[in-house]
Every structure is written in C-alpha cells, then in structure tokens.
Amino acid sequence: MFILSGCNGSGKTTASYSLLPDLIGCSELVNSDEFAKSLSPFNPSAASVMASRYMLMKIKYMLSRKADFIIETTLATRSLMNTINEAKSLGYEVTLLYFWLNSVDLAIKRVKKRVESGGHNIPEEVIRRRYIMGVKYFFEIYAPIVDRWVLADNSKSPFAVVAEGTQNNIQIKDEEKYACIRNICYPEESVGESDPGSTT
C-alpha cells in the first residue's frame, strides 16, 4: 500500500497519474476528490462527506482482495491510522510519500491556477489549516507507524528528497530544509530531537 500525501496544491495528483504507476507498478488510485467530482461535478465540496465514505469503502475492498493500491490524501486528519494498522496486519508493506511545499502561499497559488484550468477549488482557510496539520500528523502519527516513509520538497520540479526512513532508522539528506519543515509544528526544536521512530 502506497500513501501519496501533501497539502492541497502539492502535486499529489500529478504524481499519482504521471510518476507512481511506472515507479511502483501500481495504477489503482483511491482519491476522495475524484469521488467527490463524480458525485457532484459542479460543486465537489458539497459531496465531500459522501466521497470520504466511498473512499473508505474502496480501501476496504482493495484490502479484502489483498491488491496493491495508492491512497491520495492531505494527511491532515487521523482517519488513516486504522487503515494502516489493518493493512499491516494483513501483511501489507506500507510506504508513505509526503510532498511538502516551501510556503502555504505557494499552495494557495497552485490551487488558484488549478481552478483557472477547470479544476476544483479549496477554500483558502482550509488550505492553510491542512498545510500545518498535514506536517504535524506526518511526524506525530503516520511516519512512526508506516514501514517506510519519504519526505520530499515539491516546491519545484523535479522534487527533492529531504529525508527518508523506517521505524528503526532515518536518513536526513538536507538538514536545513528538514529543520525548516519540523519548525512548522515544533518551532523550539533543534534537528535530531523527536525524529519519527528512529536514530540519526
């Protein structure tokens, strides 16, 4: 199971269609935004609750088949904790990729550009909240429970890996940027403190 995550506008959908199928050999994508657009093409946000339910149903179906699949998410809620634990209990190896952007303003700008091209809109206050909560939950909840994680800066193309790790080890490739990302949620922390599930 592969989790592709990041704030709105971070490039998740682009990667899920253009990069990951070839990279990991999997083309099954579970994305609540796609469900919402199918349910309510002219106002996807109105169908967000139902879309989330459909997403969970699709995940359970994929798990029941023991099939490989990709979940696309902002990681700004705790809702995937049980899914990850269930997947691991079924023998899945869970990999998490988080796309970070160097500012929330860049995220807002990208979403606006997407809307101008006919894509779906996300309210600015929601983008700002998810920008912070996604990073917070990446470090506090999700990185410690997955088998492998990769934290990448997708502010420009191609993306750059900042750090990667497992439950037993972490490799920081860009100390300054890693500290900058953690500083979003832990402003008084120095690099090396409370790193997710690891030693440096």
PLM feature spans:
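Conserved lysine of the Walker
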Residues: 12
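Conserved substrate/cofactor phosphate-moiety recognition/catalytic segment
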Residues: 16-67
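The conserved Walker
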Residues: 8
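Glycine-rich phosphate-binding loop used to anchor ATP phosphates in small-molecule kinases
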Residues: 50-101, 134
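NTP-dependent small-molecule kinase module
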Residues: 140-191, 199-200
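A glycine- and Lys/Arg-enriched "phosphate-lid" helix/loop adjacent to the NTP-binding pocket
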Residues: 92-140
